[in-house]
Regions:
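Juxtamembrane loop-transmembrane helix junctions in multi-pass integral membrane proteins
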Residues: 3, 48, 110-113
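Hydrophobic transmembrane helix segments
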Residues: 15-65
Length: 144
């Protein structure tokens, strides 16, 4: 049990990541610039290419928040392990919450389906993607 206790701060930051991501999406959707953008599009349908921009925005926001949480974990807890278990513990709350709330959507026949799938992918694997890139960069710097 003591082995898993050292990953509790990562789980706590993962819960904070889930709260931050849902809060930021709620703010952007209700009073932000995306609301104004989507409101100004005439004949908005599932085949509108504006959904590709929305998908890029949502995925970028999720990856930015994931990177912020990983870097804050490194700064706040320098003595705790920074490994794949940490990344999984940090990813788990957001990934499970998004899968529970939105479900799995792989309808890639229109732009709306592509946007949902890309957002789901970045929410379910964002921390793991950023952590993998950090590990790869660390290995390259160690070899040089």
């Amino acid at each position: 049990m003591r082995l898993f206790m050292k990953y509790l701060p990562a789980l706590g930051l993962g819960i904070l990541l889930a709260v931050l991501s849902f809060t930021s999406f709620a703010l952007v959707a209700s009073a932000g610039y995306m609301h104004a953008l989507l409101g100004n599009v005439d004949n908005l349908s599932h085949t509108s290419p504006v959904y590709l921009g929305l998908a890029a925005h949502d995925a970028g926001l999720l990856l930015l928040l994931s990177g912020l949480m990983l870097f804050s974990y490194q700064l706040l807890f320098p003595r705790l392990p920074f490994d794949w278990y940490t990344a999984v513990a940090m990813q788990m709350p957001l990934g499970l919450l998004v899968l529970w709330a939105d479900g799995v959507s792989f309808n890639l026949t229109d732009f709306y389906g592509v946007a949902r799938a890309l957002t789901l992918f970045s929410a379910a694997f964002g921390v793991l993607i950023i952590f993998g890139l950090l590990q790869r960069r660390g290995r390259r710097l160690a070899q040089a």
